[in-house]
Amino acid sequence: MKTDILIVGSGCSGLYCALNLPVSRQITVITKAGAEENDSYLAQGGMCMLKDESDYQGFFDDTMKAGHYENDEASVEIMIRSSRSVVEDLLQFGADFQRDENGELVFTR
C-alpha cells in the first residue's frame, strides 16, 4: 500500500484527524475491526464537552479516573479545553449527535 498519511484507528479521533488534513494528500484510515466496532461508535450516554469553567475540574477528574491516572495531564487539559471547538467542527462536518426533545445536544457531563 502506498499512501501519504496512514491513520491507525477509525474512531472519532482518527476520523477527525483525517478531516483536518490537506485534501491534496492521499490519506488511508485502517482499523482492526469493522467500522461499527470501534469504541466511538459503541459509546453510550452522550458525549463530553466543557460547557463552562465551573465544569473543568470535574471533567478533568473523570478523565483521569477513566484513564486509571496514567493519562498525561497536559494532554488531558488540551483535550478538555478544545472540546467545544471539536464538537463545533464535527457539527459543521455533519456529525449526527444525540439530541433531546428540544433539539439540544445531549452531553454526559
Regions found by a protein language model. Name each.
Residues 35-109:
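Conserved N-terminal/central alpha/beta ligand/cofactor-binding core
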Residues 4-29:
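N-terminal Rossmann-like FAD-binding beta1-loop-alpha1 element of flavoenzymes
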